Amino acid sequence: MDGINTIVNIRSNTMNFEQLIRYTLEYGNQLRYYHWQTPSYAQHEALGEFYNKLSELTDGLVESWQGRRGNITVDQGSVELVDYTDVETVIESAESLREVYEAFKEKIGYGDIQNQIDEIVELINHTIYVLRLK
C-alpha cells in the first residue's frame, strides 16, 4: 500500500474509482492488522470501530457508484502489511487515506457520491481525533 504514489495518481487524474476502492480495501486490511497489534485497548477499540465503519461506508459507496456507472472490476495483486510501530504511524496512514478521498472527490461530479466521500472523510477525522487522545 503506497499512499504517496496513490496521492500522486489522484492529483495527476490517473486514478480511477476502481483504483480508489482497491486502495481502500488494502488500507482496510492494514487497519485490521494494526487493530490486532496495538498494545493499547483504547486504540484497539478505535481501530476496530474505524475498520467496521469504513467497510460499511465503502460498501455503500461502491453500490452507489455501480448504480450510476455499472459494476466495477478491481485489479488483482498482493497486499503487503506493515507491523504496528506507534500510533503516529497509524494517524499518518489515516491522513493519507483522507487526502486520497478528498482529491478524488474534487474530480467527480456526482453529488451523492461526494456526500458519501464526505462521510468517509468525517469517519477518518473522528478516528484521528480519538487516536490522539491520551
Q: What is the role of each PLM region?
A:
Residues E18, R22-L25, N29, G48, ...:
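Generic structural signal for well-ordered, non-transmembrane alpha-helical segments
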Residues H44-T73:
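Conserved alpha-helical segments that form or flank metal/cofactor-binding pockets of metalloenzymes
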Residues E26-E49, K105-G109:
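Helix-loop segments that flank and shape redox-cofactor active sites
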Residues Y34, T38-Y41, L61-S64, R68, ...:
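Hydrophobic stripe of amphipathic alpha-helices that form coiled-coil interfaces
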Residues S78-R132:
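Acidic/histidine-rich alpha-helical segments that form the ligand environment
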Residues D2-T14:
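Short, Lys/Arg-enriched N-terminal segments with co-localized hydrophobic residues
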Residues N13, L20, Q43, G109-I113:
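Residue-level recognition of alpha-helical structural elements
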Residues R11, R68-D83:
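Terminal beta-strand-rich extracellular "head" domains
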